[in-house]
């Protein structure tokens, strides 16, 4: 394919994408395929000779689309949103064309510097404390990670290194292996499974703190665990506070937990993967109160801020906490400006070496939507979630299980878990809408998350009518 054909095919692909998204509402939101469906539709080996572009395009509808779950359908209410917008798609095209691997400033100055500036832009939108911003010569700063899971792992490994070095400075005879056995981290019993995985990868203990009646980690429970473990000779070093849990969008009490972490010299990491986008709205900024106590903070613009995956925003107060943990400096990566104090080499802020020009997506989206446009988008989703909540409350057969704060509604039929499992199975088998469940204490709960960029009140109303009709069918069957 030369540039002439690329121009033609590129325009065709833009048309295909626009047609796909314009018509996505007419496609079943969940695919009707069985595991292994695709292997029977494609050859077992790659072609020896080139195939035509026309053949590939035909196979998209024939082979790929039948197995796609349409995350951007206005009838997709599962998980949490995954962001999508035309400006971000255009930026991704440019990112692919430039094709740099921005591991250092010298590898692509624009890639590095735009990321630093965009992370400061976003930090200011969130009203983060100045300590988290890079500015012109700040000690902190932001970095784009691949996911919130990656950000949690980076923070844990940095905290582990920092604590071990502090302990060895005071007692040089202590080995890293001996200290690793004593290190312990903490998070809520409602935290994402990625926190547990970070502990597994990092080789440290992770303890779940029991949450309160609102599924929130509170100071008393954390303090009790810290004191018990210290008395047993363990060394607390890391706490993850979740703002907007995956199960029910609950919020740990940051204002209570933060001071304890600071008093104990424990690294405090905030995981706000979903909810963090809402903090750009003044009416939701209170949910981030206490961020000043944190050492690191993370949320995913690729969830709810119209920046396509992947783009996970992470800030730290002290960049040296990361660079001292991850610094590797082989001669083939060195460059003349790296010791100048004027640049950032993001390879020292992350797990992998390579990194894409992801800040282009932020630049395009922030400029083409503006802060007001992004705020309006968040507010629309929150309004729709409250509309759904109101519909549920009007039906005495159902109950709302947690406070609705942002774009997630947790609800269920009053009755047994089996009744709700049957309802969910009926909902997803019908393939008109898509939901996933959670478990809150001993209850099986349905989650209704407002996700699509194009979802409107009419879609919410139709979804509720569908759920209500299926519920009637399930309840009738139970009585028979």
From Swiss-Prot:
It catalyses: L-dopa + H(+) = dopamine + CO2; 5-hydroxy-L-tryptophan + H(+) = serotonin + CO2. Signal peptide: none annotated. Substrate binds at residues 82, 192. Sequence repeats lie at residues 58-115, 118-178. GO terms for molecular function: 5-hydroxy-L-tryptophan decarboxylase activity; amino acid binding; aromatic-L-amino-acid decarboxylase activity; enzyme binding; L-dopa decarboxylase activity; protein domain specific binding; pyridoxal phosphate binding. Pfam families: Pyridoxal_deC. The modification N6-(pyridoxal phosphate)lysine is found at residue 303. Changing residue 252 to A/E: Abolishes decarboxylase activity. Pathway: Catecholamine biosynthesis; dopamine biosynthesis; dopamine from L-tyrosine: step 2/2. Pyridoxal 5'-phosphate binds at residues 148-149, 246, 300. Changing residue 355 to A: Abolishes decarboxylase activity. Belongs to the group II decarboxylase family. PANTHER family: AROMATIC-L-AMINO-ACID DECARBOXYLASE, GROUP II PYRIDOXAL-5-PHOSPHATE DECARBOXYLASE. This is Aromatic-L-amino-acid decarboxylase. It comes from Rattus norvegicus. The lineage of its organism: Eukaryota, Metazoa, Chordata, Craniata, Vertebrata.
């Amino acid at each position: 394919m030369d540039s002439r054909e690329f121009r033609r095919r590129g325009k065709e692909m833009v048309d295909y994408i626009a047609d796909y998204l314009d018509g996505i509402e007419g496609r079943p939101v969940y695919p009707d395929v069985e595991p292994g469906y695709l292997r029977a539709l494609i050859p077992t080996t790659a072609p020896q000779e080139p195939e035509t572009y026309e053949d590939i395009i035909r196979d998209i509808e024939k082979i790929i689309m039948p197995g796609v779950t349409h995350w951007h359908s206005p009838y997709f209410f599962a998980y949490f949103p995954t962001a999508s917008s035309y400006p971000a798609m255009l930026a991704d095209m440019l990112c692919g064309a430039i094709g740099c691997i921005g591991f250092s400033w010298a590898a692509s100055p624009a890639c590095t510097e735009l990321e630093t500036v965009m992370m400061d832009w976003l930090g200011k939108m969130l009203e983060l404390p100045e300590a988290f911003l890079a500015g012109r010569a700040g000690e902190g700063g932001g970095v784009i990670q691949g996911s919130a899971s990656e950000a949690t792992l980076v923070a844990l490994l940095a905290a582990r290194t920092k604590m071990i070095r502090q302990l060895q400075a005071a007692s040089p005879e202590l080995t890293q292996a001996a200290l690793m056995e004593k290190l312990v981290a903490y998070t809520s019993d409602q935290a994402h499974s990625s926190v547990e995985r970070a502990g597994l990868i990092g080789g440290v203990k992770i303890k779940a703190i029991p949450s309160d009646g609102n599924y929130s980690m509170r100071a008393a429970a954390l303090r009790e665990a810290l004191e018990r473990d210290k008395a047993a000779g363990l060394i607390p070093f890391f706490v993850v506070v979740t703002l907007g849990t995956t199960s029910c969008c609950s919020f740990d009490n940051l204002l209570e937990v933060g001071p304890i972490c600071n008093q104990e010299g424990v690294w405090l990491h905030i995981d706000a993967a979903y909810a963090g986008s809402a903090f750009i709205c003044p009416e939701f900024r209170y949910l981030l109160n206490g961020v000043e106590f944190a050492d690191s903070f993370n949320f995913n613009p690729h969830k709810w801020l119209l920046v396509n995956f992947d783009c996970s925003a992470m800030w730290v107060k002290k960049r040296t906490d990361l660079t001292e943990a991850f610094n590797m400096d082989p001669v083939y990566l060195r460059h003349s400006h790296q010791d100048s104090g004027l640049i950032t080499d993001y390879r020292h802020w992350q797990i992998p070496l390579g990194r894409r020009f992801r800040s282009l997506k932020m630049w395009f989206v922030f400029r083409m939507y503006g802060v007001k446009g992004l705020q309006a988008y968040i507010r629309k989703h929150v309004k729709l979630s409250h509309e759904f909540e109101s519909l549920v409350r009007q039906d005495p057969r159902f109950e709302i299980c947690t406070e609705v704060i942002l774009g997630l509604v947790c609800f269920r039929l009053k009755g047994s878990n089996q009744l709700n499992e049957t309802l969910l199975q009926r909902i997803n088998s019908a393939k008109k809408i898509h939901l996933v469940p959670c478990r809150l204490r001993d209850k099986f709960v349905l989650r209704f998350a407002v996700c699509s960029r194009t979802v409107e009140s009419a879609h919410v109303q139709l979804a509720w009518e569908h759920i209500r009709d299926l519920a009637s069918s399930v309840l009738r069957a139970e009585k028979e």
